[in-house]
Amino acid sequence: MIYSIIICAGALLGFLILQKLLAPKDTRPPLPPGPWRKPIIGNLTDFPPKGTPEWLFWAKHHERYGPMSSLEVMGQTIIMINDAHLGIEIMHKKSALSQMIPDAPFAHMAGWGMSLATERNKQAWKTIRANMKQEIGTRRAIATFHPKMEIGIRRFLLRTLDNPDDLRFHIRKEANAFMMDVAYGYTIAPHGKDELYDLTQQSVRQFSHIFSPGEWSVNFFPILRYVPSWFPGASFQIKAAEYKRTIERMTMVPYLWIKDQVARGCTRPSILLRLLQKGHYESGSHQEQVLVWTNAEFVMGGSDTTVSAVSSFFVAMALYPEVQHQAREELDRVVGPTTLATFEHRSQLPFIDALVKEVFRWHPASPLGAPHITQEDQIWDGYLLPKGALLLPNIWTFTHDPSVYHDPMVFKPERFLERQSSPPETDPMKFVFGFGRRICPGRFVTDEKLFLIACHAISCFLISPKDPGAPEPDWLPGVISQPGPFDLNVVPRSPAHEELIRSIETDHPWKNADATDISQFMARNQMI
């Protein structure tokens, strides 16, 4: 990487000096404060070190520079927003002024050019979002999937009962099983190898690496995309090719599998099938790519945020037993001690509803929000946000701002309840899933699944840390963050609750899985 930077820096040095000499004097307000810009490279070395939680690194800017800070890398201005009030004003109320998607050369090289995070073709972007909004973008749309959610969550309880030490694996499996069933009509293997499930997991892991801020030199020096992979410092070319192979298989395998089912006359309901039947898609066309990426976004985006939220929920219940007890008391009183809640109970369970909000606030799934680009010069608090600046909202600082949330480091669901002494605190749903037209279209999936998992897990299990004195775990860095290792005891409340969990085996026995069929299909078409 250093060789590539030196080459580009030398080529740009003369241009930047000339530009500085010839540029007219700028009479606009100053940029927000920030670290000193080094010659040529600016703040290229001021990004978080590898392995550092990005949101905590940027939160230090709040302490040093105030609610907004700025950096500059090779002429690209970056504005960090670390204040909840300011973030809502700039990115929500004035969202029309910063809706553009930032360019991400490495993501395009890695095959993610059609992702909602990078797609700059307005029509394609609108089509993907419109498809997702129609299928999962409202609570009314999500209600059609409630039966699938309920069955999947009960199976999750059973797997957790049988193998509680593999809780994180069960959380991931349940999240992906639901998404793949709804998107593709695909039934994952309850045990053993599943090629499509593994491919989805690999794509999700690579997503976090691809979109990690400051990770790839080519994002700062786009000309590097033309450097051959054998050139010193160009190992990103090899990674891009590897990631591209993965995402091409992940997007195309289920699509071609469903087309094969259509040809054989053995289809089953799915989002992809419904969209496929609405139009004609030429092989290799842009319209076909829009179609397959609609479903890829649904499967990967919804599953990863759900995994993060549910993992954080279990950690919170172990660390705050008094909250777990209060939630269980409400469930026993409203629903019954040996009855599982349904979505219809939510309006009668205010503490559980508040608990779900507190999970989202306590540790947002995406602690750094999706970046936006300003479409015109803006002035805020006497500082300039120039046209073309990259806006990065630090969602974690929004949800841990003591001027917005009392005792922000403490898990307190009651902060969202109606009380005579004080009004409820700000609903974190206002910002934890993004802003404006770039808000996460799958947010209601994560919200409703977390609600039902919380209800069922608290009703059926006693959750505690294996080490009673264990501190709160560290949260792992990444675009989607999850709690680090934290061993839990998850045991049934009573024999009656164990029997309730096991009733899923007779109420809804496993259907035949599609793992063998998809493996054979991939082998026939040389996709493995």
Curated annotation (Swiss-Prot):
Its cofactor is heme. Pfam families: p450. This is O-methylsterigmatocystin oxidoreductase. Belongs to the cytochrome P450 family. InterPro entries: Cyt_P450, Cyt_P450_CS, Cyt_P450_E_grp-I, Cyt_P450_sf, Cytochrome_P450_fung. GO terms for molecular function: aflatoxin B synthase activity; heme binding; iron ion binding; monooxygenase activity. Heme binds at residue 440.
